[in-house]
Swiss-Prot record:
The chain crosses the membrane at residues 1-25, 35-55, 81-102, 124-126. Residues 26-34, 103-123 are cytoplasmic. Residues 56-80 are extracellular. InterPro entries: GPCR_Rhodpsn (IPR000276), GPCR_Rhodpsn_7TM (IPR017452), Melcrt_ACTH_rcpt (IPR001671). It comes from the Eukaryota. This is Adrenocorticotropic hormone receptor. The keyword Transmembrane helix applies. It is a multi-pass membrane protein.
Length: 126
């Protein structure tokens, strides 16, 4: 089994898992709170990262099959764009994790004021 096929499979599973998280939050009214909004943000970042890796693996597979010229202009540009988007997705995931950590901090140390500090309006702005 080729590494591209393994990464392709893992990326597809990652997209599906994050879609399940998004659907669960969207369908269940009890999960539509600021904390779950942050989790959705993380799921979207992770899903985009998986999608970019799927695109990159498709390019590699097409190159290995002879449909793309190795290190041609299109492949190099597409690979650079995909890598840049993947890094942006990674930064989005790190930011989402930081916001989730801040939300948990506020929940623990400012429990009585949590709902006045963390509002949906502020959540959307973040």
């Amino acid at each position: 089994v080729l590494p591209e096929e393994i990464f392709f499979t893992i990326s597809i599973v990652g997209v599906l898992e994050n879609l399940i998280v998004l659907l669960a939050v969207f369908k269940n009214k009890n999960l539509q709170a600021p904390m779950y909004f942050f989790i959705c943000s993380l799921a979207i970042s992770d899903m985009l990262g998986s999608l970019y890796k799927i695109l990159e693996n498709i390019l590699i597979i097409l190159r290995n099959m002879g449909y793309l010229k190795p290190r041609g202009s299109f492949e190099t540009t597409a690979d650079d764009i995909i890598d840049s988007l993947f890094v942006l997705s990674l930064l989005g995931a790190i930011f989402s994790l930081s916001v989730i950590a801040a939300d948990r901090y506020i929940t623990i140390f400012h429990a009585l004021r949590y709902h006045s500090i963390v509002t949906m309006r502020r959540t959307v702005v973040v």
